[in-house]
């Protein structure tokens, strides 16, 4: 049945529920009652009956009628009448609401503050039930003869509590059809990405590009109003993208990131369709850096990293090796067409490699793997020596393609980068 229009949704819900309640409890006079919660209150007063209320997709009006303030106000008032305060606890035994967004905020407070919320920011005990856990995916891969490492690379990424959680639609589809593609976007609110990431908030575009390159970015989630219009800064945009599932969230580090290969491809498509001038120019410079790396042109690599740092990431203040790694991550953004997300701190023979870029399978015979070691106020030669001494290439012993060793150093006194590149000889 259909309410006919968004404006008629709340009156329609009240009318239908009152009619159904009258059929179930004809002995209770509901003729003067105007709301569903008023009817439940009358039934409780007369018969002592309590109700279980389940609302699926509670937030559909918040999302689909984002700019219709009148409809949203009517709906929020309906929910407040149904659930807020002590009166509803008399006639409601249990209320269970599902949706994408948390409960709408009025100013800084939840419109319904007597609910326990389980969200993509903090799933609590529901974490293992939001999607398939890694253990479940591993079992399914054995059952359906799929490569678990590939499934993990393409569809893992959501970290909820202690659980790695996979999108159930994507997992079921890959088990059934065996083709690594973006099953996810067909079921999500993909059209929401483009207007969101195109909003002109300070620092938003550079954060999006950093995450596309494989980095994590800090995000403050408290100011988000849990709707699709009340955005005040980049943190609100990043937070809604977390709730929509397009970003994952590390609750310990308070950082957002793109969870996996397939969602990263969605961001690339959205950014390209938006025709960001910043992205087009940045990608060109990043491509120059990648080409210089592949050509083993150490001087050009150092110059390009310097240029990218000055032009695009000047807000990152160089003060240690970690800040250098942040610049390096975004500098190699163009590599993401041919390489999987860079692996940070990969365990190796004796220690951890700073960055490892592994080509996608279709590019293994075209592009080399890159082992990158960073140094701060030392030398590029020291970085290369450490790669060899600590046997970092052993981490890629099953890799059959070419491997380049890349050492990068930043000299605090000269304010310059240095680079050295060698081909690994087994």
What are these regions (language model features)?
Residues 1-320, 335, 339, 343:
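Phosphate-binding site recognition
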Residues 42-47, 336-366:
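Active-site metal-binding core of divalent-cation-utilizing nuclease and nuclease-like domains
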Residues 52, 368-372, 404:
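Structural motif
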Residues 72-78, 376-393:
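Mg2+/Mn2+-dependent nuclease catalytic core
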Residues 81-89, 239-247, 329-334, 386-406:
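Metal-dependent nuclease catalytic cores in nucleic-acid-processing enzymes
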Residues 322, 326, 330, 353-355, ...:
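Feature representing long, continuous alpha-helical segments
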Residues 328, 353-359, 367-376, 390:
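Conserved catalytic cores of phosphodiester-cleaving nucleases, focusing on short active-site segments
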Residues 395, 401-426:
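Domain-level recognition of nuclease-like catalytic cores that cleave nucleotide substrates
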């Amino acid at each position: 049945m259909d309410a006919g229009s968004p404006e008629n949704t709340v009156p329609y819900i009240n009318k239908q529920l009152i009619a159904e309640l009258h059929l179930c409890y004809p002995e209770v006079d509901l003729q003067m009652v105007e709301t569903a919660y008023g009817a439940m209150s009358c039934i409780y007063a007369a018969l002592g009956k309590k109700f279980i209320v389940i609302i699926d997709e509670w937030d559909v009006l918040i999302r689909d009628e984002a700019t219709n303030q009148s409809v949203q106000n009517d709906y929020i008032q309906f929910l407040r009448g149904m659930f807020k305060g002590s009166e509803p606890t008399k006639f409601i035994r249990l209320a269970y609401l599902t949706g994408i967004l948390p409960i709408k905020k009025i100013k800084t407070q939840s419109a319904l503050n007597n609910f326990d919320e389980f969200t993509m920011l903090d799933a609590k005990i529901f974490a293992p039930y939001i999607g398939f856990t890694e253990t479940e995916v591993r079992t399914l891969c054995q059952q359906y003869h799929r490569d678990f490492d590939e499934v993990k690379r393409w569809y893992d990424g959501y970290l909820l509590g202690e659980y790695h959680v996979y999108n159930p639609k994507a997992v079921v589809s890959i088990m059934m059809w065996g083709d690594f593609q973006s099953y996810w976007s067909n079921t999500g609110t993909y059209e929401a990405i483009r207007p969101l990431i195109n909003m002109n908030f300070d620092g938003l575009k550079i954060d999006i590009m950093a995450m596309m390159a494989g980095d994590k970015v800090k995000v403050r989630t408290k100011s988000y109003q849990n709707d699709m219009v009340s955005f005040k800064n980049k943190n609100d945009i990043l937070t809604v993208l977390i709730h929509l599932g397009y970003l994952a969230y590390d609750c310990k580090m308070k950082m957002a990131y793109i969870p996996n290969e397939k969602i990263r491809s969605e961001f690339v498509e959205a950014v390209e369709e938006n025709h960001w001038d910043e992205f087009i120019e940045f990608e060109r410079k990043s491509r120059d850096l990648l080409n210089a790396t592949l050509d083993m042109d150490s001087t050009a690599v150092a110059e390009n990293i310097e240029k990218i740092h000055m032009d695009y990431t000047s807000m990152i203040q160089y003060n240690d090796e970690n800040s250098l790694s942040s610049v390096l991550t975004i500098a190699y953004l163009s590599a993401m067409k041919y390489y999987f997300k860079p692996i940070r701190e990969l365990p190796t023979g004796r220690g951890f490699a700073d960055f490892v870029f592994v080509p996608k399978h279709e590019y293994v015979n075209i592009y080399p793997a890159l082992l990158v070691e960073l140094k701060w106020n030392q030398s590029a030669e020291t970085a290369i020596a450490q790669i060899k001494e600590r046997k970092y290439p052993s981490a890629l012993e099953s890799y059959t393609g070419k491997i380049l060793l890349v050492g990068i150093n930043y000299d605090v006194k000269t304010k310059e980068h240095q680079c050295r590149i060698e081909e690994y000889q087994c």
